[in-house]
Regions:
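Alpha-helical transmembrane segments
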Residues: 8-23, 107-114, 166-167, 208-215, ...
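Intrinsically disordered, polar/acidic, low-complexity terminal segments
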Residues: 8-50, 54, 64, 68-87, ...
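Short hydrophobic alpha-helices at membrane interfaces in multi-pass membrane enzymes
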Residues: 152-171, 206-207
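Transmembrane catalytic cores of multi-pass membrane glycosyltransferases
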Residues: 23-78, 130, 173-299, 306-315
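Short, Lys/Arg-rich, polar N-terminal cytosolic tail immediately upstream
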Residues: 1-5
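Membrane-interface micro-motifs in multi-pass membrane enzymes
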Residues: 105-151, 259-262, 299-330
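Transmembrane alpha-helical segments
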Residues: 84-95, 142-154, 185-192, 267-273, ...
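Signature aromatic-anchored transmembrane alpha helix within multi-pass, membrane-resident enzymes
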Residues: 286-290, 334-359
């Protein structure tokens, strides 16, 4: 009974974190390149061709294809939740060098999880997009797991060679272009440090380093990378110093600013060390050195992107990972120092992050519920148009309501030919719609004529779909109050052969509609 009581808070904490991620992914439709990688399939031949002609990310590409192959929203949601939790867990456990749960983790785990959510440079595309997560969450999970084992081997002076760590080393090296070079660099620096300290090097570190370097070579030297680069003359045609200058002056600062909340969390923890003499005397200096080192590596992962013609926000997830490690090292050192001010300080920062997380999460949940409703509308249009024999048609783009920031949006990239291939037609185009049309899926239906149907809910969303273009005004009875809305003031869009109109009419039930 006592054992059960001890593990209950830990289980509840992990379960809540799991459900938080699971629920958002449950409401997330497959989108963007998810369709492309589903069509890619899981055959070795198709992935070899992909490697030779497009991308060296064999680990990420196979991960996304395997997940999408299931065509199961349950699998998608579980994979998103598990990958996020395991990623955060390795971040939490690296400073201690053990995977066993200890007292400090009751504060450290929520601190890292909350910070991962509220400071993520592009949460929608790194966590809730299957292909994006495969490229920037799963691969970074392999990297941080490798860092954990490599760090543990170093501090415990372990000599054993593990085939699993060797495989993990290769996977970490073959992660993504911003992080992979630093995996190889860290492994080489670890060998150099041991050689300097002991005048000899453990064979396991040599093996793991060679595996990591091999993974980096497979990733970076992919023929597909060179084929893609051949079409980027606007970038590669410039002298290298010009590319570096443009990157440093126009791109780096904007991308580093994306994770500003992580800097605030890190600064607050550092201030606890600086301004408390007792903490400075008792804190583990090795943890501070490790924190400084991973910050430098994190900045390096951003600087190295001068080599790439594009620098999407989601790529910053690798940089963000190293700042999370820095937060973990300092917070762990504060908690293990035994100084009350350090423990209280970490607890206070965790509570602050938790408050922001709660606000952000509720916005995200509401927003993704609405996009799930929009997906129902899109699927109905696809079914209807295919049944009518159409080979080319339009679906509305997703519309996001207010989130913490635009980084919460999943990717809106849309390839008409790929969507068409997935649904066995020639092409499916998208059209931008500047209103939330989920009310069409889950609102009350009002048949106004053979050509016109209205939809409403008690939250104030009101939409009309008509085969004829509307003019004049619409009069509504909302909770017994009359409201007149000029049609020209309603938001509108034309989807295929239909005219869509939308207005926010205030909360209440619509009981009557007339033109």
């Amino acid at each position: 009974m006592n054992t059960m009581l001890k593990i209950l808070p830990k289980t509840a904490m992990i379960l809540l974190a799991f459900l938080a991620i699971f629920l958002i992914e449950w409401y997330t439709p497959i989108h963007s390149d998810d369709y492309r990688y589903y069509l890619l399939g899981i055959s070795p031949e198709s992935h070899f061709h992909h490697y030779m002609t497009w991308s060296g990310r064999i680990i990420a590409d196979y991960t996304s294809a395997l997940i999408l192959y299931t065509r199961s929203q349950l699998v998608y949601s579980i994979s998103a939740a598990v990958s996020t939790l395991v990623f955060c867990y390795f971040i939490v456990k690296t400073p201690s060098g053990t995977l066993r749960w200890n007292k400090s983790d009751y504060l450290l785990f929520p601190l890292i999880f909350f910070t991962y959510w509220i400071s993520n440079p592009n949460l929608g595309q790194t966590t809730f997009w299957i292909v994006g997560a495969a490229n920037y969450l799963w691969t970074n999970l392999f990297v941080v797991a490798w860092l954990f084992f490599f760090y543990t081997i170093t501090i415990k002076n372990s000599k054993a060679i593990s085939p699993w760590v060797a495989l993990l080393s290769f996977m970490a090296g073959c992660s993504n272009e911003s992080v992979s070079p630093f995996v190889s660099l860290i492994s080489v620096l670890a060998i150099a440090y041991e050689l300097w300290q002991n005048k000899s090097v453990s064979r396991n570190k040599i093996v793991y380093s060679l595996c990591a370097i091999a993974g980096s070579c497979v990733l970076i030297l992919s023929p597909g990378n060179f084929i893609r680069a051949s079409g980027k003359e606007f970038w590669y045609g410039r002298p290298i110093f010009e590319r570096i200058f443009i990157h440093l002056t126009e791109r780096v600062h904007n991308h580093l600013a994306l994770i500003w909340i992580a800097y605030v969390v890190l600064l607050l923890l550092v201030l606890l060390v600086i301004f408390n003499k007792q903490i400075r005397a008792k804190i583990d200096k090795t943890s501070l050195i490790c924190a400084a080192l991973v910050v430098c590596i994190g900045i390096g992962t951003s600087l190295i992107m001068f080599a790439s013609p594009s620098y999407p926000d989601r790529v910053m997830n690798g940089t963000f990972m190293f700042f999370l490690l820095a937060i973990s090292f300092i917070a762990y050192a504060l908690l293990k120092s035994g100084v009350k001010a350090g423990v209280v300080g970490v607890a206070a920062v965790t509570v602050l992050c938790g408050i922001v997380f709660l606000w952000s999460y509720l916005l995200m949940l509401n927003g993704y519920k609405k996009t799930a409703g929009q997906e129902i509308v899109r699927q109905k249009i696809i079914t209807k148009e295919i049944a009518a024999g159409k080979q080319k048609f339009i679906i509305p783009d997703y519309y996001f309501v207010k989130l913490q920031n635009s980084g919460g949006h999943f990717g809106l990239f849309h390839d008409p030919a790929v969507y068409g291939e997935y649904y066995h037609v020639q092409a499916i185009f998208k059209k931008k719609v500047n209103f939330d049309y989920s009310v069409i899926a889950n609102g009350a239906k009002h048949s106004l004529s053979n050509e016109t149907t209205a939809y409403s809910n008690t939250r104030g969303d009101f939409a009309i779909i008509s085969r004829e273009q509307l003019t004049g005004s619409i009069t509504l009875s909302v909770n017994g109050r009359q409201k007149t809305i000029p049609v020209e003031k309603m938001k509108h869009a034309e989807i295929n052969d239909e005219f869509w109109y939308y207005a926010s009419v205030g909360k209440g039930e619509i009981t009557a509609i007339s033109f």
